[in-house]
Amino acid sequence: MAKQDDASIQSPDIGEPPAAAREVFGDRLRLACDYAEFLATAGIERGLLGPREVPRIWERHILNSAVLGEVIDEGCRVVDIGSGAGLPGIPLAIARPDLKVQLLEPLLRRYNFLAEVNSQLNLGCEVVRGRAEDPAVVEALGGADVATSRAVAPLGKLTRWSLPLVKVGGAMKALKGGSVAEELERDAKEIAKAGGGDGTIELVGESKVAEPTHVITIPRIR
């Protein structure tokens, strides 16, 4: 990606980064802009995002993911399950360089995209190809502080995939839509069976994005 001053960062399709991006990413805004360009070019070409998402890349995808950092403690190891195009893991890694972010993705073309972005932007993430439910993956990545995800699966199934990857006392934190309260009630037995405690729902990014992000946190208690 070409280097340029933050003040002139723009793309004909993506546009200028919003003011909130400067607040969230600080002196790493350049990396966020380079990632936005990856999404708008290679991400579209490889079918990781639809073309109609380009004008909404900042608000709906990058900032929506990065604000998850508001509810993650400093220095945590984070496993991003089904990372896909790198959401929420890559924006989180850019906004929070104190975190150790591991991007977990089973599909080869998505894994290759993640590896390319991680290498070219020198993000320092670990990119792993595999499925969260695979015992070998649990052995390799288990004991994390936090497991993140975005639009991966229904909450009950997501809990079964996520909690084995975190230590007791850790938690899964999933970005979910407005129906998350109904999911939490519907899947309560499945969550408990997976070793999860009482779930909490928080809104993050209220001062930064037009539509704040719903985060469901489920602690691993056994």
UniProtKB/Swiss-Prot annotation:
Q: Where in the cell is it found?
A: Cytoplasm
Record-listed S-adenosyl-L-methionine binding positions: 82, 87, 132-133, 150
Q: Which UniProt keywords apply?
A: Cytoplasm, Methyltransferase, rRNA processing, S-adenosyl-L-methionine, Transferase
Entry's Gene Ontology cellular component terms: cytosol
Alphabetized GO MF terms = rRNA (guanine-N7-)-methyltransferase activity
Q: Any idea of its EC number?
A: 2.1.1.-
Asked if the record carries the keyword NAD, the reply is no
Query: Which Pfam family, any one of them, does this sequence belong to?
Result: GidB
The record's annotation in PANTHER family points to: S-ADENOSYL-L-METHIONINE-DEPENDENT METHYLTRANSFERASES SUPERFAMILY PROTEIN
What family is this? Belongs to the methyltransferase superfamily. RNA methyltransferase RsmG family.
Q: What is this protein called?
A: Ribosomal RNA small subunit methyltransferase G
What organism does the record attribute this protein to? Corynebacterium jeikeium (strain K411)
What gene does the UniProt entry assign to this protein?
rsmG
